[in-house]
Amino acid sequence: MFALGILPALLVLYLRRSVPESPVFEQRTRTGARRGVMETMRGRWKLLAYMIVTMAVFNAFSHGSQDVYPTFLKLQMHFDTHVTSLLTIILNLGALVGGLVFGQWSEKIGRRRAMAIACVLALPAIPLWSYGGSVLLLAIGAFWIQIAVQGAWGVVPGYLNELSPDDVRGTLPGFAYQLGNLLVSWTAFAMTWVAHANGGNYAIVQSVWIAIVAVLLAILTWFGPEAHGAKFGVTPETGDATMRGSPAVAD
C-alpha cells in the first residue's frame, strides 16, 4: 500500500508542468507587491487565533466521529470484519455527499451559516449512530452523521481562503489547519482511554464527545468572522472579516 501511494504523488509533476498559476499570483509576481508574514498579519492575530481554535474543534469533530468507530463496531457491537468494513464504507459515502451538498449550499446561504447548520444536524443522528442496534439503523446513523460532519468540513477550504489576506493565503489556511489538528491529536487516545475506564462503553463516550463538539463548533462558526465573496487580489483592511450581525457581511 505504501508503494502504491507513490503513484498519486507523481501527479504533482503533471500539475507543476501543466496547471497554470492563478491570475492573482501572476499579477502579484509581476508587480512585486508582496509583504512578509509578520507585516501582513499585523492587527490580525485574533483572526489567526480564531482560525486555529476553530480548526482544532473541527478536527475533534471529524476524528471523534471516525477514528474509534470501527473499534466500537468490533469490540462493543461484536461485528465481524465484513460488517465493520461495510459500515465504514457507508460512513464515508455520507461524508462525500455532505461535503458536496453543504459546500455548494454555502455559496447561497453563507459559509458560517452552512457550517453551523451542519453541526446541528449531527445531533439527532447520534442515537442511531451509537445505539441503532441493528446493522441497518447503524448504517443510517453513520451515513447521516458523516453528512453533517463532512458537510461542515466541505465549507472549510473556501471559508479559510476567504478569511486569509492575499500575501499569506498560501500559508495561513494550511498552518491553521495543521496546528489545530496538532492540538487535538490526542482525540482517539482520549476516547479509547475513557471507554476502557467505563467498561468498554464506546457508545456513550463517542456520543457525549460528538454532542459537545458539535454544539461548540456551531457556536464558533455561527458567531465567527465571515468574508464570503471576498475578491482575491484585493487585500481587505483589518476587520473586513466581520462578526455575525455586522452590516458589512451578507448573511
PLM segments and residue spans:
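A membrane-interface helix-boundary motif in multi-pass transporters
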Residues: 1-4, 193-212
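Flexible cytoplasmic inter-helical loops of multi-pass small-molecule transporters
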Residues: 16-36, 230-240
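Helix-loop junctions at membrane interfaces in 12-TM secondary transporters
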Residues: 130-141
